[in-house]
């Protein structure tokens, strides 16, 4: 936000509490290993016309070079088995279904809901840019779909899709990326 406002000629003051600037984007080293604080990977950067890609290109003045993630971009490890998350989306769906063939329809339902959340999220944030009469007229319409997801926990929502606790565990295995465990996190952040 600060970068975009600055590019528009606005005066901006950014206050950083941490000793190293960068917020969610900085790294640190411990015992010879380098760790990133928050951004591990960002999907969709290979699509140059995507909103996210255009936003990052604008903020960085096209100075970021994006690397494609490995085919296996994440691995969820349980004591008895590991589950790979594979790109692209179609391969991810195939892989999850291969682990849980009896859950095929529930997995399709999950993917459909996640896709809906993504669409609803853009409408929700667009509504925040409206003011006055426009906010009054369009605000409720633009936010209603998002709020039906955001006001429930990830665990509650997934439990309505499936009763398979292992599948829920795998699908929520990345909960550290959004900071709260599934029984506390908003499903909209999942």
Locate predicted features:
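N-terminal glycine-rich phosphate/pyrophosphate-binding loop and immediately adjacent elements
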Residues: 1-119
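Rossmann-like flavin
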Residues: 79-186
